[in-house]
């Protein structure tokens, strides 16, 4: 298909917001656009009932054609975003290695080349600090397209050229899956044994630095640590952070993506206020915990950590790398009890908490479904969560929105305030199947398929129109297609 280089479908909704196209090769652009040119007429020909609720959507000829084209596009996207041992999320917008992005991307890379998938994880863990923390960004190469860079973070030699905060610890989850599905068992076992001590040290850091009181749930001290940066869950807690007299700055993200899809200035001012305060404390873990004006119990971080602990325990047995499993079992036992304190009976959903007030944070977000992924919900609570999810899906054209669509803070295109993210859909789908809600999981998978088919390979998607938004030719979306959506 002729046309400009893009990852957008050739026809978009009238409500779409134009933004700068991603910098991609002509080859990738043509593959993506060919994929979309086949998909859109096929989607139009199908009934809405067939599109969204067919229980065997992976069995038809349309899916077979779409699968071949999508997999080719996704492989090429990951190849183009490969910087030689690590993968960037998207060119320009995110030019470095992000923590949970790389862990999730490794799942897609494993469908292409196992050795490269292990290299992704190994490169990430090589940035681990002396205290066990794994930073949320590793600045491997200089770049002028992102702010704040390494000169702002000023991280000490632990090593240098990283940020001073972390992200949800997906890595152990990825290591287990790579080992379980490995074709090269010798390589996989050797790499799992190499990475196990680093994973264990990271998890120990979480409980030492972020749960010094032994509650069973860890704290996050910056919205960027949650991975869900501008979630409405943080509005109330973040608003109490006084904006310091921070140096003037220029946001680079707005040169790549429309401002209506990104966090607002008042949020960025507070993000940077926290950053400069943490730097002034020399990233001392005790001072950060007790002196930060923002400290929350984030469901995403805690659910992923719990699932990662479950997988770390499995890895201990599979690799023989840990002879005493009692420490890990203690973490999971305490968390299993503590998660009950995050369930909101009236909402039928789990909620994040403000650790400085002890109160629930008011916004209902997609993180509230992740206790199913972690396996910490009772049957009764899981049933309530499934009912709530069904209502959310009924309220939008495509799920899962990152915020309750009935919430006044819902914004369909603004980052984590409404858009659909395939990584969340994958985790929730896995959780639903874990609890026996296969039909609801199939519905989430079907919506995810429709989004990719009609919207391209984007960072996230509008839940009302299906339009791709944020960064284009996005690595973890491509990885989810390879490792989940089109993996049959």
From Swiss-Prot:
It comes from the Eukaryota. Pfam families: MGH1-like_GH. Its EC number is 3.2.1.170. InterPro entries: 6-hairpin_glycosidase_sf, 6hp_glycosidase-like_sf, Glycoside_hydrolase_63, MGH1-like_GH. The active site is at 229 (proton donor), 459 (proton acceptor). Optimum pH is 6.0-6.50. The keyword Hydrolase applies. Keywords: Glycosidase, Hydrolase. Disulfide bonds: none annotated. Substrate binds at residues 94, 98-101, 146, 167, 227, 262, 415-416. It catalyses: (2R)-2-O-(alpha-D-mannosyl)-glycerate + H2O = D-mannose + (R)-glycerate; (2R)-2-O-(alpha-D-glucopyranosyl)-glycerate + H2O = (R)-glycerate + D-glucose. GO terms for molecular function: Glc3Man9GlcNAc2 oligosaccharide glucosidase activity; glucosylglycerate hydrolase activity; mannosylglycerate hydrolase activity. It is an enzyme of class 3 (hydrolase). Activity is not dependent on divalent cations, but it is enhanced by Mn(2+). GO terms for biological process: mannosylglycerate metabolic process; oligosaccharide metabolic process; protein N-linked glycosylation. Optimum temperature is 40 degrees Celsius. GO terms for cellular component: endoplasmic reticulum membrane. Catalyzes the hydrolysis of alpha-D-mannosyl-glycerate (MG) to D-glycerate and D-mannose. Can also hydrolyze alpha-D-glucopyranosyl-glycerate (GG)with lower efficiency. Belongs to the glycosyl hydrolase 63 family. This is Mannosylglycerate hydrolase MGH1. It comes from Selaginella moellendorffii (Spikemoss). The lineage of its organism: Eukaryota, Viridiplantae, Streptophyta, Embryophyta, Tracheophyta.
